[in-house]
């Protein structure tokens, strides 16, 4: 009800309910303030109109009501911050599960694309070398001669995830500040050059299920860059496909077969 009333996107991550609850309470508080202060403003316009008070009163307010109301507002804001916002943020930052229990994905932002990399079956990300970066063929500078890199899977603007699996996105940027945001996951985090920032969430609705829920057969989870990053910012879009564990494994196996074919037909791994 609250989600629909506020116009929030459909929820598709386990932690999103807490965030939606916080957003709802903030809006309730804002509504109370709006009605309260708006009513008080109208009251003062009528109560102290010129026809009733032709001579200015220089004494000022003698009641303590305004002081107590301001204290009450400050207390409520503190409760929202300490009781809701900080615990939710701590859960996102301090309670990230061990990487052994999650799917770890590297997402590197650049003008104007999202470069996605999976470690492959060995669970180890291969070596990268900035001298090997090629804007078209190798945007990450992945060194395929490194044994750990032979099974690394890379995609452009496409993030594939298994449902109900803890996900840790290691977010980086090659050039300027970008911002990784997926509204349905209630996730948004700046990508800053020189930093690797972990983003943790658990998607709990597959893309197919969301298409059924929304009645939109073309629905896709979209990665939107929420930070103005240059002239091409408007086209920096990526997409997330949430699959069942079996579907994700089938996709990963197909990618591994493709890598083996490329290794046999070229010197990409030599």
What is the meaning of each model-derived region?
Residues 2-23, 45-270:
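Non-transmembrane, membrane-proximal soluble domains of secreted or membrane proteins
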Residues 23-36:
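Alpha-helical transmembrane segments
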Residues 36-44:
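Central hydrophobic cores of alpha-helical transmembrane segments in multi-pass inner-membrane proteins
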């Amino acid at each position: 009800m609250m989600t629909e009333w506020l116009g929030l996107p459909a929820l598709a991550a386990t932690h999103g309910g807490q965030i939606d609850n916080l957003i709802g309470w903030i809006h309730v508080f804002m509504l109370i303030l709006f009605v309260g202060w708006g009513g008080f403003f109208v009251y003062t316009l009528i109560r102290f109109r010129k026809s009733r008070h032709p001579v200015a009163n220089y004494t000022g307010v003698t009641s303590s009501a305004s002081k107590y109301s301001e204290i009450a507002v400050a207390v409520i804001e503190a409760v929202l911050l300490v009781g809701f916002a900080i615990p939710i943020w701590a859960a996102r930052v301090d309670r990230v599960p061990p990487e052994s229990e999650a799917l770890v994905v590297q997402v590197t932002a650049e003008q104007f694309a999202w470069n996605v990399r999976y470690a492959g079956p060995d669970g180890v990300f291969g070596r990268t070398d900035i001298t090997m970066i090629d804007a078209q063929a190798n945007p990450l500078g992945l060194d395929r001669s490194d044994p750990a890199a032979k099974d690394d899977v890379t995609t452009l603007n496409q993030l594939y995830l298994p449902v109900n699996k803890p996900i840790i996105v290691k977010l980086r940027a090659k050039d300027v500040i970008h911002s990784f945001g997926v509204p349905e996951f209630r996730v948004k985090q700046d990508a800053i050059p020189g930093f690797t920032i972990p983003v943790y969430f658990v998607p709990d609705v597959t893309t197919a299920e969301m298409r059924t829920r929304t009645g939109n057969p073309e629905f896709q989870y979209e990665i939107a860059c929420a930070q103005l990053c240059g002239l091409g910012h408007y086209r920096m879009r990526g997409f997330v496909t949430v699959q069942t564990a079996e579907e994700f494994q089938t996709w990963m196996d197909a990618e591994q077969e493709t890598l083996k074919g490329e290794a046999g037909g070229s010197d990409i791994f030599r």
